[in-house]
Regions:
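Aromatic-rich carbohydrate-binding modules that target alpha-glucans
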Residues: 9-60, 72-143, 151-166
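Eukaryotic non-catalytic protein-interaction modules, chiefly N-terminal intrinsically disordered
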Residues: 1-10
């Protein structure tokens, strides 16, 4: 979802890090989003050698945000996840995950796709990430009961028959 390295991620202390690359000539940069009621001054970003950074403690969920660079609003151009802001522009979107799907083994496979009730059984959307021992995919799931299966190189395979409850 990001062009290059992620510009929003969770650090090892479960703090969400927002990065704005470049703009070193800016004098003030703020982070604004639904997590701070779209405040224009509550979350200042700190200047670094590669741009600007802010750390925010977020609960799992879906978040919208923009940067305010010397008074000018701007979406995160390095984040491909975005939704209309209702004013003919876009908000950048970030999901703080609450679940990590894991599938052990099958390391000989080229692709594993996760499909389930949470994405209308879409067979292409959720590509899992290969690890040394299997496959993983962190996600944000709404509370409720979810059923799912895996697709290994185009072939439907087993899943946890009990599904996931949260």
């Amino acid at each position: 979802n990001f062009k290059g390295a992620p510009t929003v991620y969770e650090n090892d202390k479960d703090i969400t890090v927002f990065k704005l690359l470049n703009f070193q000539n800016a004098s003030k940069v703020f982070l604004s989003g639904n997590f701070n009621d779209w405040s224009t001054g509550q979350t200042p970003m700190q200047k670094t050698d590669s741009g600007w950074v802010a750390e925010v403690k977020l609960k799992p969920g879906k978040y919208f945000y923009k940067f305010i660079i010397d008074g000018q609003w701007m979406q995160d151009i390095n984040n491909n996840l975005r939704e209309s802001d209702g004013h003919n522009n876009y908000n950048s979107t970030y999901y703080h995950y609450n679940y990590n799907f894991k599938l052990e083994g099958l390391t000989d496979k080229k692709n594993i796709i996760l499909a389930g009730s949470f994405n209308n059984w879409n067979e292409k959307e959720l590509k899992m990430q290969k690890t040394a021992t299997g496959w993983v995919l962190p996600m944000f799931l709404k509370d409720g009961t979810h059923t799912y299966k895996f697709i290994a190189d185009g072939e439907w395979i087993f899943s946890n028959p009990a599904g996931w409850y949260g």
